[in-house]
Amino acid sequence: MPLNSDKRAYRILISWTPASGGTEPIEYAAWLARTTPVEVRVLSAFVQPWHEVSMQKLGGKYNKWFAQEAKACKQAVKNTLRAAGIPREQWDKEYSVLMDGPSKPQLLTQAAEEFDADLVLLGPNQGAAKGRFLAGSTADSLLHYSPIPVGLSPRAAKLSKHGVTRLNFALTEEQGIDDVPALIDAAFLASTWNVPLRIIVFSSHGLVNAPINDNLDVALELTSQWREHSLGRLDIARERVGERFPDLEIRTEIGSGKGWRAAVDSLKWKKGDLICLGSSPMGALERVFIGWRATELLPHLSVPIIVWPSRKTS
């Protein structure tokens, strides 16, 4: 979510269809609705597999079928939003939209722009393990070009009834401490929602992970240098956030283990945790673009995620 200057509710576009295997993105939206005022709209995208000439031959038959699908989809969306506990006043007037086209990522981007969305929510590939996120083709595309922040939900995530209770920001090597805009965005949300901010550095190599034939002294020296470097980055991050948000509760931690799963699981996570990541810079383009480290990290995160587009420091 970007910084809202007009104080309006956060507009959330949810990617979901009744044929989806789960309701994770709608549950994610309901979780955010328990945290802050939101306005939600559900986009159900139908990808046309047929050539344009074939569509023209179908003519009115296709239009009639599409209208019937849109009506059925709207009823399913209505039932699911209610079941998730999102108050009716937080639904957009046009809360269910069915669109067709050759590309689902393009349809989502178009719909997000038309809705002036602050956030696009996507569910996991249903092949993901419970409590973990696995990107499908649509998520993978948006994570490499979306102009709008992208929210991702692990499969069957257990979320707090009290909404978001802590913001987390992950510093990766690609972004480093120079990724100030995304860090400041996370701090802004934490301050606005009156929740603490935890800034994290992850290492997937463990603090001591030397091969059998390596010199242990060298490994220990490298580990010591990495830890000192990481603590320095965390101190700078804490200082920069503290200057902008002096009343915000800020903690810093290092998650380390042999592999990303162990690094993530080395830290304590709560049902109210939301983790945020920035994007690797793409010149003048303000787009979501995750680097290889973030790509490796995502499948092991067990809490909802927001990935911000890169942008210049304001």
Predicted regions located by residue number:
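General small-molecule cofactor/ligand-binding pocket signal
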Residues: R41-L43, D92-D100, G151, R198-I200, ...
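Glycine-rich, Arg-bearing micro-motifs that act as flexible, cationic patches
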Residues: L119-S141, L274-H300
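Short, flexible loop segments at boundaries between secondary-structure elements
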Residues: V150, T295-P299, V303-S314
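Short beta-strand elements of ligand-binding domains
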Residues: L121-P124, P149-A156, G278, I305-P309
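Structural beta-alpha unit
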Residues: M1-R8, K64, N79-V120, G242-I275, ...
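Small/aliphatic-rich secondary-structure junction motif
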Residues: P2-K61, T165-L220, G242-R251, H300, ...
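A short acidic, glycine-rich active-site loop
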Residues: G60-C73, A219-G232
